[in-house]
């Protein structure tokens, strides 16, 4: 019995020792990882170091023209036109990127800036933080996959990976938040009512004599793609320019079913643009779209 108890005590001691070694190694590994991270951070060259949340203004030109965005009350806007339907994820990604740029190399004793193409920068990105501090990044020539970069007012030249440009490499059209458009076809179109010059024409799916007409207008409604805009935030006083004022426009009201419930889509059709399109608006939207004459003719059954 004593031998048995002694064996159990030995096994218990070994187990305790193994547990102690395990936790000791785990602690040591964690310390080593933390140390490695600290060393890596210490070796990292920060070109910019500003929290994205603190950035309130972005101004840049990376080959798509001058663009500027501002943030007010945590909301981003296109600075020249606050009514522009901006997808906020774009400036948010830009701020996240530009506020935390690291360099591959820091060239402290290099050539003059013209040797790096920084006397006439290819691109510029400027941001301002909530305290009014401004930083302007100048992008010169490329070296491999990197750009030569410097901060305006600072003589230090860095190499920065070209991916820094990616979040900025969009046109204003790319960053527009366009309206949603429903899926409409002959299978779910219930009725279409067209009002023009005070006269109303109705196409009803329950009228068997209008089966061909319903198929035609449903084909037109189903072919609409809200992908090209002529004006992103039209003012009421400018609607007549597009033939979309109340006295000039054609009103199309389409009743359709979605998830077994009836929905109403209201379209306004205006003038032709001279290039094979017509100006079109959705009810309650400020965006003027371009839709082909052919599609509009099908919607109007002409």
Feature-to-residue mapping (PLM):
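Secondary-structure "cap/kink" motif recognition
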Residues: 1-302
């Amino acid at each position: 019995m004593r031998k048995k108890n002694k064996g159990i005590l030995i096994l218990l001691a070994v187990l305790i020792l193994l547990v102690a070694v395990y936790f000791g190694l785990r602690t040591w590994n964690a310390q080593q990882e933390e140390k490695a991270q600290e060393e890596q951070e210490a070796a990292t060259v920060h070109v910019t170091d500003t929290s994205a949340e603190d950035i309130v203004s972005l101004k840049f030109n990376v080959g798509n023209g001058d663009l500027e965005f501002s943030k007010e009350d945590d909301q981003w806007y296109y600075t020249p036109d606050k009514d522009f339907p901006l997808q906020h994820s774009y400036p948010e990604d830009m701020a996240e990127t530009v506020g935390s740029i690291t360099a591959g190399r820091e060239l402290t004793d290099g050539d003059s800036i013209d040797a790096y193409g920084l006397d006439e920068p290819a691109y510029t990105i400027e941001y301002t933080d909530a305290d009014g501090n401004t930083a302007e990044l100048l992008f010169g020539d490329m070296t491999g996959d990197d750009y030569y970069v410097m901060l305006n007012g600072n003589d230090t030249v860095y190499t920065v990976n070209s991916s820094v440009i990616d979040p900025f490499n969009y046109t204003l059209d790319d960053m527009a938040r366009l309206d949603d458009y429903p899926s409409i076809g002959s299978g779910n179109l219930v009725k279409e009512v067209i009002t023009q010059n005070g006269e109303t024409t109705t196409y009803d799916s329950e009228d068997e004599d209008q089966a061909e007409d319903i198929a035609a207008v449903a084909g037109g409604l189903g072919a609409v793609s809200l992908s090209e805009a002529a004006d992103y935030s039209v003012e009421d006083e400018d609607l007549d320019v597009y033939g979309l004022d109340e006295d000039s426009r054609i009103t199309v009201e389409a009743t359709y079913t979605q998830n077994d419930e009836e929905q109403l889509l209201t379209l306004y059709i205006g003038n032709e643009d001279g290039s094979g399109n017509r100006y079109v608006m959705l009810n309650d939207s400020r965006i003027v779209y371009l839709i082909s004459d052919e599609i509009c003719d099908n919607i109007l059954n002409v």
